[in-house]
């Protein structure tokens, strides 16, 4: 939706009035200000008699926290509600302050409009009118009335009650500022032009709360703008400043009367003291006389002061000109430093402005180099003050005869010494913020510095060097990148619907005959389905390796042939390449994941069990020799060596490396796995512990912690106190990100990495 550019009241109002009137200055249906996205939907321009089939109401002036449920509770008391929608921002999902309520029949809509208009919802009166989607009907100016000079006590309901006697009102609105205070003007939109004319005739010039109000037809913004330009070209009112305070009214008038007939001349005075404030206004009868006075008296000395004489301007006009001047200066400054100003972060604390300049001086001429620092606190302790007093010794003056030349030379030396002492007495610097800026004289030098210095190690820290950007530009780019990532993640989530999510449920293998076995496959490898757990089977924890959990082998099956619960080489469909129909005997029973059993149970013809397979079964693919795709692991007997009656004692699976973690995960096992699977193994090891602390955000926090080094993560598996500290730190970062971006902590767990990236980017942007 496009933003609704509302019209301003007549020219004597401030720019803040602009958004409060009808759409594009010609909306016939809205007398209210609207936010972006409300353009095509804010106003109501028809009655049920015009469109009897329409039962859609617009509800405006809503508190941002109002939800569909609150509105349903209110509007369902009138009749059956078909639907309710609170309009929200597409990116932030924050309420735009208005909603639509659709009834099943028009009669209920009429009653709701009559009974619920200006009802308090969360302390704010709502404004209800008929919704009109046709822009042609909305943009007619017929029946729209503008009222100004309203008392601040008059609200929407009071204005509606005042003007309801002259006809059917479609919309009524008193303009308010961001704090909810009246701006002193409002709009009333009648159903017919006759009702609007009748209201203007009877109310214009009358007193409302002891204030004389102006009531007139609403003029479109484009029409007012053209009229305003005409008024500027034919001005008669002159503004004069830098007037001497002793100047009287007669002297001020005599100064301008020689240029033509004057209707009024006045000096602004203080209300309490009555003294002149140094400026005044002169109004001529003709534009030519006013222009002649401006031409002759501007920059002329009057009582020792140079006068400023120019066309009198409205407040909003002056503010608009100042805004344009500021914007022009900002653009000029930005273009001046475009491509030459560098942003450097990750600076060491001992790098100051001089060292920063030295680092980059070899790449070109530096116009400025600055390390950003905190403000240094002033020393206020009594001991420091006394030390300062003691250090200041009283100066003694020696009375010795000196010639003039000697005096001049000594004075010069004293001045130089004082200047040097001032330079040497530097103000204490605050702590470095870790980033700074370097400005070069040309873009080529800056580009060379970025190429050479980015990621260079300085004092043990890699520098980040890039072209500096304005804060608003960085924020918009950050929001765009976050929105793009959200879109991609939503698309990926939709495409991967039904696939198991990481760290959300234990990796469980199922016994034969269960529905998750591939049909028509003899002894088929099981594939996992998300969230499915066999009833009665003891649940296990991720990462309990120690060889691998004890699984009771079936008849004729080598125990080492059995697959551990976490077989990372298994493909998306549950089977590695070459394993379909591999002839694995139909002997996979339910895994005992809760505890590590001692020796494997063996059936007839089972070979003695050797050293357990590592948790990460690598190399499952066509290149394997065992089982047509299954590689032969160390300590694993070949198929032909397993005979009947072989009953050598099995090695206890519970035995593991002394340096292994309680989960059986060692640094050697971790390094033996591919890099992509190392994070998966670590994640499955720490996820249950994080889930015990933060059940709702366990996925997010796990993803954030997986950004750490593998060795640090492995240490966290055994150190619950350190893990809890890291979890609290990650939770603090995530909460800060949610506060800054208005996010929702209830997002899917798959977005954990996105939360980490966004929080880091937000922290970096906040620093700069």
Curated annotation (Swiss-Prot):
Fetch the PROSITE patterns from UniProt.
PABC, RRM
Q: What GO molecular function annotations does the UniProt record carry, in alphabetical order?
A: RNA binding
Which cell locations does it reside in?
A: Cytoplasm; Nucleus
Task: Quote the biased-composition stretches of kind Low complexity, using this chain's numbering.
Answer: 39-52
**An example Gene Ontology cellular component term from the record?**
cytoplasm
Q: Which cysteines are joined by disulfide bonds?
A: none
Q: What is its main location?
A: cytoplasm
Tell me which UniProt keywords the record has, alphabetically: Cytoplasm, mRNA processing, mRNA transport, Nucleus, Repeat, RNA-binding, Translation regulation, Transport
The RRM domain covers which part of the protein? Answer: 55-133, 143-220, 236-314, 340-470
According to the UniProt entry, which residue ranges have a biased composition of type Polar residues?
1-11
- Domain PABC positions: 662-739
Q: Which InterPro entries match?
A: Nucleotide-bd_a/b_plait_sf, PABP-dom, PABP_1234, PABP_HYD_C, PABP_RRM1, RBD_domain_sf, RRM2_I_PABPs, RRM_dom
The protein's matches in SUPFAM superfamilies, at most eight in alphabetical order, are given as: PABC (PABP) domain, RNA-binding domain, RBD
Comp. bias (Gly residues): 637-646
| Sequence ranges of Basic and acidic residues compositional bias | 753-768
Specify one Pfam family.
Answer: MLLE
GO BP terms in the entry? mRNA processing; mRNA transport; regulation of translation
Q: What is the protein's given name? A: Polyadenylate-binding protein, cytoplasmic and nuclear
Q: Which organism is it from?
A: Coccidioides immitis (strain RS) (Valley fever fungus)
Q: What is the lineage of its organism?
A: Eukaryota, Fungi, Dikarya, Ascomycota, Pezizomycotina
Q: Which gene encodes it?
A: PAB1
């Amino acid at each position: 939706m496009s933003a609704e550019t509302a019209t301003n009241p007549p020219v004597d109002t401030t720019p803040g009035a602009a958004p409060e009137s009808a759409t594009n200055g010609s909306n016939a249906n809205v007398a209210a200000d609207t936010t972006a996205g409300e353009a095509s939907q804010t106003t109501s321009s028809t009655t049920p008699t015009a469109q009897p089939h329409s039962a859609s109401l617009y509800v405006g002036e809503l508190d941002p926290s109002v939800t569909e449920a609150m509105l349903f509770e209110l509007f369902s008391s009138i009749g059956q509600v078909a639907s309710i929608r609170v309009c929200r921002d597409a990116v932030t999902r924050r309420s735009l302050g208005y909603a639509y309520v659709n009834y099943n029949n028009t009669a209920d809509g009429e009653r709701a409009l009559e009974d619920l208009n200006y009802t308090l919802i969360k302390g704010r009166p709502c404004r209800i009118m008929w919704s009109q989607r046709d822009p042609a009907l909305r943009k007619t100016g017929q029946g729209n009335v503008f009222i100004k000079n309203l008392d601040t006590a008059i609200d929407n309901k009071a204005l509606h009650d005042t003007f309801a006697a002259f006809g059917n009102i479609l919309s009524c609105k008193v303009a308010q500022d961001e704090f909810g205070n009246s701006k002193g003007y409002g709009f009333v939109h009648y159903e017919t032009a006759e009702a609007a004319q009748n209201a203007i005739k009877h109310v214009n010039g009358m007193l409302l709360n002891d204030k004389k109000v102006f009531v007139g037809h609403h003029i479109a913004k484009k029409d007012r703008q053209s009229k305003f330009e005409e008024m500027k070209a034919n001005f008669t009112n002159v503004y004069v400043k830098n007037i001497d305070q002793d100047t009287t009214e007669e002297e001020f008038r005599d100064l301008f009367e020689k240029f033509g007939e004057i209707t009024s001349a006045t000096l602004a005075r203080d209300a309490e003291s009555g003294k002149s404030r140094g400026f005044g206004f002169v109004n001529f009868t003709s534009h030519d006389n006013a222009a002649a006075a401006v031409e002759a008296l501007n920059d002329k000395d009057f009582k020792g002061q140079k006068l400023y004489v120019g066309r009198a301007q409205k407040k909003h006009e002056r503010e608009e000109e100042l805004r344009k001047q500021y914007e022009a200066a900002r653009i000029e400054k930005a273009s001046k430093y475009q491509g030459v100003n560098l942003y450097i972060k990750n600076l060491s604390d001992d790098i100051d402005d001089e060292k920063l300049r030295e680092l980059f001086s070899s790449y070109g001429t530096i116009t400025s180099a600055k390390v950003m620092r905190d403000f240094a606190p002033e020393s206020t302790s009594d001991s420091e003050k006394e030390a300062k007093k003691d250090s200041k010794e009283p100066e003694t003056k020696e009375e010795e005869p000196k010639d003039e030349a000697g005096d001049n030379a000594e004075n010069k030396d004293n001045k130089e010494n004082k200047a040097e002492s001032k330079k040497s007495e530097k103000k204490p610097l605050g702590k470095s913020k870790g980033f700074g800026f370097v400005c070069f004289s040309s873009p080529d030098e800056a580009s060379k510095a970025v190429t050479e210095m980015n990621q260079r190690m300085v004092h043990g820290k890699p520098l980040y060097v890039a072209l500096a950007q304005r804060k608003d530009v960085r924020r918009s780019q950050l929001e765009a990148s976050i929105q793009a990532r959200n879109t991609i993640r939503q698309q990926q989530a939709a495409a991967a619907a039904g696939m198991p999510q990481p760290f959300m449920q234990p990796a469980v293998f199922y016994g034969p005959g269960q529905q998750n076995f591939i049909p028509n496959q003899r002894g088929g490898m099981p594939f996992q389905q998300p969230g499915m757990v066999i009833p009665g089977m003891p649940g296990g924890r991720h990462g309990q390796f120690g060889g691998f959990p004890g699984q009771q082998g079936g008849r004729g099956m080598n125990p080492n042939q059995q697959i551990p619960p976490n077989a990372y080489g298994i493909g998306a469909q549950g089977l590695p390449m070459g394993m379909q129909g591999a002839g694995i005997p139909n002997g996979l029973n339910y895994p005992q994941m809760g505890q590590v059993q001692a020796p494997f149970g063996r059936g007839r013809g089972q070979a003695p069990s050797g050293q357990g397979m590592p948790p990460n079964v690598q190399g499952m693919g066509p290149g394997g020799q065992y089982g047509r795709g299954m590689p032969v692991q160390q300590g694993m007997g070949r198929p032909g060596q397993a005979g009947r009656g072989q009953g050598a004692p099995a090695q206890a699976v519970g035995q593991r490396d002394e340096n292994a973690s309680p989960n059986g995960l060692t640094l050697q096992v971790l390094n033996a796995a591919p890099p992509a699977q190392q994070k998966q193994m670590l994640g499955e090891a720490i996820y249950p512990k994080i889930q015990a602390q933060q059940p709702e955000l366990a996925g997010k926090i796990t993803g954030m912690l997986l950004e750490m080094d593998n060795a640090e993560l492995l240490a966290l598996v055994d150190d619950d106190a350190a893990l809890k500290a890291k979890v609290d730190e990650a939770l603090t970062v995530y909460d800060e990100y949610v506060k800054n971006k208005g996010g929702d902590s209830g997002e899917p767990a798959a977005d954990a990495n996105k939360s980490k990236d966004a929080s880091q980017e937000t922290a970096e942007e906040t620093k700069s």
